[in-house]
Amino acid sequence: MNSLLMITACLVVIGTVWAKEGYLVDVKGCKKNCWKLGDNDYCNRECKWKHIGGSYGYCYGFGCYCEGLPDSTQTWPLPNKTCGKK
């Protein structure tokens, strides 16, 4: 029983360590902007939305940075997107 608990705990830790992270993007392929660096309610809320699926978000380099994202979530920079430029 203890072995099963230990294996389960290890899998949870590995999943957390290997989770994707990065800057959120808008429809133009740009980083979602933020102005209050560090802990930021807006970024945390955006990262945790159901369609995003992140575990935590904060403002870093004036962009919303998310941790614990699923692989399906797009992060900045996007290939073939120039952030609204032609």
Curated annotation (Swiss-Prot):
Keyword Signal included in the entry's annotation = yes
Subcellular location, principal: secreted
Disulfide bonding pattern of the chain: C30-C83, C34-C59, C43-C64, C47-C66
Q: Does the keyword Secreted apply?
A: yes
InterPro entries associated with the record: LCN-type_CS_alpha_beta_dom (IPR044062), Scorpion_toxin-like (IPR003614), Scorpion_toxin-like_sf (IPR036574), Scorpion_toxinL (IPR018218), Scorpion_toxinL/defensin (IPR002061)
Task: Please list the GO terms describing molecular function.
Answer: sodium channel inhibitor activity; toxin activity
- Spell out which residues are annotated as carrying Cysteine amide: C83
Query: What GO biological process, any one, is recorded here?
Result: defense response
Compartment(s) of residence: Secreted
Q: Where is the LCN-type CS-alpha/beta domain?
A: 20-84
List GO terms (cellular component aspect).
Answer: extracellular region
Summary of the tissues where the protein is detected: Expressed by the venom gland.
Q: Which UniProt keywords apply?
A: Amidation, Disulfide bond, Ion channel impairing toxin, Neurotoxin, Secreted, Signal, Toxin, Voltage-gated sodium channel impairing toxin
The organism's superkingdom is given as Eukaryota
Cited CDD domains: neurotoxins_LC_scorpion
Sorted alphabetically, which Gene3D superfamilies does this protein's record hold? Knottin, scorpion toxin-like
- Give the signal peptide, or none: 1-19
Q: Which family does it belong to?
A: Belongs to the long (4 C-C) scorpion toxin superfamily. Sodium channel inhibitor family. Beta subfamily.
Task: Relay the domain remarks.
Answer: Has the structural arrangement of an alpha-helix connected to antiparallel beta-sheets by disulfide bonds (CS-alpha/beta).
Question: What is the documented function of this protein?
Answer: Binds to sodium channels (Nav) and inhibits the inactivation of the activated channels, thereby blocking neuronal transmission.
Q: What is this protein called?
A: Neurotoxin E1x
